[in-house]
């Protein structure tokens, strides 16, 4: 695994352009499996996870071409519905090809997924949803096989928790079950859900209510060719916003959707960050003092996002008092805390809540990245810290941040990557 060397402290300034959303691109690329004609996707970020999902489509027999953030997908002439373990193990989102493949071709097999190790992230909701849609499910030797049986005319699925992955999986699968009317309650409301629904509708599907807790899907028989542009990555935008504030910098963040990050901006303002909205797609972040302590609760959208939890803890580690961050989505998502302590942070974790006792500054050290967003948090910490910070096993960061070394360098950071 690679290593990132950061010389700090930095003060980020300038401008950074946000890439297309990883969390929107992955389910949309997976949904391309149901296309009867070609689809063209624009603003697709060039990331390890995106490349893996494209490999999965190629394994299924699709014909793809990916260049300059544009992906074309054409349906297979001879489909393969048994997706190999070596692809699926790399990331959790790969499991979302099971339902679309089985709905399209009658039967499919996918290994249980891999991805970030950040606590319990069960696929039970996915499987229960597929069963209600008329699929028989068999799990043997780590492989899940779904086979389409008699299609129900009316289906009501109520998720116990508004899972993003389960919402996307069920929505995409139900979209091509011709003759089936599906109501999905307690659905996730994230912007990526809306983007997926817009893509499905661009293909001729009939999905209504995405972005609310109740989604209605009328299955269609055929889809049409379409062109769709992926929304900006709100997690990347939020990460850079926190990084600028944490380094007491002054920078403009471009090509984001400001309305997607209201919860983050509320927290940053409470901590004393100056945020100037230039327009709907650009903001200026400015900070010239240590942050004020705040209380943050991590909840499903439109609340504060779990994927920005490690970053905000890092920012608050130099606050002028004691802050708390309570995690309600992935309660064990605190592996980064031990690494932050190595840099001088004073943090306790108790029953899903991090208690952060602000210190005056951090100091560079060797640390290990435990997952994608933890890696991003450690990068921010390295930018904040005095001296040299060496982040080992940092390759995970390339799963979610396009050209991060180049972007940070353009913001005046001193960052170097070693394989």
From Swiss-Prot:
<dbReference type="GO" id="GO:0008360">
    <property type="term" value="P:regulation of cell shape"/>
</dbReference>
<dbReference type="GO" id="GO:0005737">
    <property type="term" value="C:cytoplasm"/>
</dbReference>
<keyword id="KW-0963">Cytoplasm</keyword>
<feature type="active site" description="Proton donor">
    <location>
        <position position="116"/>
    </location>
</feature>
<dbReference type="Pfam" id="PF00275">
    <property type="entry name" value="EPSP_synthase"/>
</dbReference>
<dbReference type="GO" id="GO:0019277">
    <property type="term" value="P:UDP-N-acetylgalactosamine biosynthetic process"/>
</dbReference>
<protein>
    <recommendedName>
        <fullName>UDP-N-acetylglucosamine 1-carboxyvinyltransferase</fullName>
        <ecNumber>2.5.1.7</ecNumber>
    </recommendedName>
</protein>
<keyword id="KW-0961">Cell wall biogenesis/degradation</keyword>
<dbReference type="InterPro" id="IPR001986">
    <property type="entry name" value="Enolpyruvate_Tfrase_dom"/>
</dbReference>
<dbReference type="InterPro" id="IPR005750">
    <property type="entry name" value="UDP_GlcNAc_COvinyl_MurA"/>
</dbReference>
<keyword id="KW-0670">Pyruvate</keyword>
<dbReference type="GO" id="GO:0071555">
    <property type="term" value="P:cell wall organization"/>
</dbReference>
<feature type="binding site">
    <location>
        <position position="329"/>
    </location>
    <ligand>
        <name>UDP-N-acetyl-alpha-D-glucosamine</name>
    </ligand>
</feature>
<feature type="binding site">
    <location>
        <position position="307"/>
    </location>
    <ligand>
        <name>UDP-N-acetyl-alpha-D-glucosamine</name>
    </ligand>
</feature>
<feature type="binding site">
    <location>
        <position position="92"/>
    </location>
    <ligand>
        <name>UDP-N-acetyl-alpha-D-glucosamine</name>
    </ligand>
</feature>
<dbReference type="GO" id="GO:0008760">
    <property type="term" value="F:UDP-N-acetylglucosamine 1-carboxyvinyltransferase activity"/>
</dbReference>
<feature type="binding site">
    <location>
        <begin position="22"/>
        <end position="23"/>
    </location>
    <ligand>
        <name>phosphoenolpyruvate</name>
    </ligand>
</feature>
<feature type="modified residue" description="2-(S-cysteinyl)pyruvic acid O-phosphothioketal">
    <location>
        <position position="116"/>
    </location>
</feature>
<dbReference type="InterPro" id="IPR013792">
    <property type="entry name" value="RNA3'P_cycl/enolpyr_Trfase_a/b"/>
</dbReference>
<comment type="function">
    <text>Cell wall formation. Adds enolpyruvyl to UDP-N-acetylglucosamine.</text>
</comment>
<dbReference type="GO" id="GO:0051301">
    <property type="term" value="P:cell division"/>
</dbReference>
<comment type="similarity">
    <text>Belongs to the EPSP synthase family. MurA subfamily.</text>
</comment>
<keyword id="KW-0133">Cell shape</keyword>
<keyword id="KW-0808">Transferase</keyword>
<keyword id="KW-0573">Peptidoglycan synthesis</keyword>
<dbReference type="InterPro" id="IPR036968">
    <property type="entry name" value="Enolpyruvate_Tfrase_sf"/>
</dbReference>
<keyword id="KW-0132">Cell division</keyword>
<comment type="pathway">
    <text>Cell wall biogenesis; peptidoglycan biosynthesis.</text>
</comment>
<dbReference type="GO" id="GO:0009252">
    <property type="term" value="P:peptidoglycan biosynthetic process"/>
</dbReference>
<keyword id="KW-0131">Cell cycle</keyword>
<dbReference type="InterPro" id="IPR050068">
    <property type="entry name" value="MurA_subfamily"/>
</dbReference>
